[in-house]
Amino acid sequence: MHGVGWAALALGVLVSAGVGLVAFGAQRWAGSTLALLAQLEATRTPPDLARYDVSELEGLPAPVQRYFRAVLKDGQRIIAAATVKHTGTFNLSLTSEQWKPFTSQQRVVTHAPGFVWNGHVALAPGIALHVHDAYIAGVGILEPSVLGLYSLTDVQGGGEIALGELMRYLIEASWYPTALLPSQGVHWQAVDDRTANATLVDRSLSVTMRVSFGDDGLIRSACFEARGAMIGKVIVHMPWEGRWSDYQEREGMRVPMTGEVAWLTPQGRKPYYRGTVSDLVYEFGP
């Protein structure tokens, strides 16, 4: 969920394409996606615990306890993996309104934390921007490609890109809420009665987000102080915020069905992702 300044470049690469080229690109992209998914599954290990025990809430900040009591029932099975499908709109520019419809499918594993997001943004009739956004074994990956054939950039590795992708994993964890439990590696620190900090460490990386809770105890927003935005070929650090709503029950847990993600720029808040969960399938620990 990066998407800054790709639209003009993508449309300049290809204004129209034949059906055969589109099909070839889709097939090639599907193969690349399968390879990433195989890498992700190879990192997967089973959760240490099979079920959530409410006793692990003892000592947590008050708003965090209220959250888990609101979304989980004692004995809830621990999520090991999830497949999430989304629909929505994506703004491809940080400086103007270039909202385009998208669909995506995301695979998430919680031990060790990782995901592969496979997105398809409709730039124009017959022209799709395919995007891989991933975090696998401490490596971050961002690859947008017109038709799955013409790569606009291919950034992967540790350091800045990996840190940003681990942030994404954590900010989206309310979709798979057992991943936010202390027993699953998240450390919570009190801020006030409506706010707490959540820290996740994976390998040499550590990320901390500020979480705000509503009157109902549910997570309403989360923010990182600085995340790298890819603007052209330059990384610019800005606060990064996600807002979540429309909580519904899935497999006994309450999870948000809609979300909006924004950069908090010096010029103001700039949303660039507005999405709805269209399908959500969990796999649980033994």
What are the residue ranges of the model-derived segments?
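N-terminal type II signal-anchor transmembrane helix
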Residues: 2-34
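N-terminal leader/targeting segments and the immediate start of mature chains
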Residues: 32-83
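Short, hydrophobic/aromatic-rich segments at coil-to-beta transitions
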Residues: 79-85, 110-118, 141, 190-199, ...
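Short solvent-exposed loop/turn micro-motifs enriched in small/polar/acidic residues
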Residues: 99-101, 126, 181, 191-193, ...
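Flexible, processing/modification-adjacent segments and terminal tails
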Residues: 143-202, 235
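Gly/Pro-enriched, hydrophobic low-complexity segments
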Residues: 197-284
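N-terminal mature ectodomain segment of secretory-pathway/periplasmic proteins
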Residues: 65-150
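Short amphipathic beta-strand and strand-loop transition segments with alternating hydrophobic
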Residues: 107, 185-190, 245-246
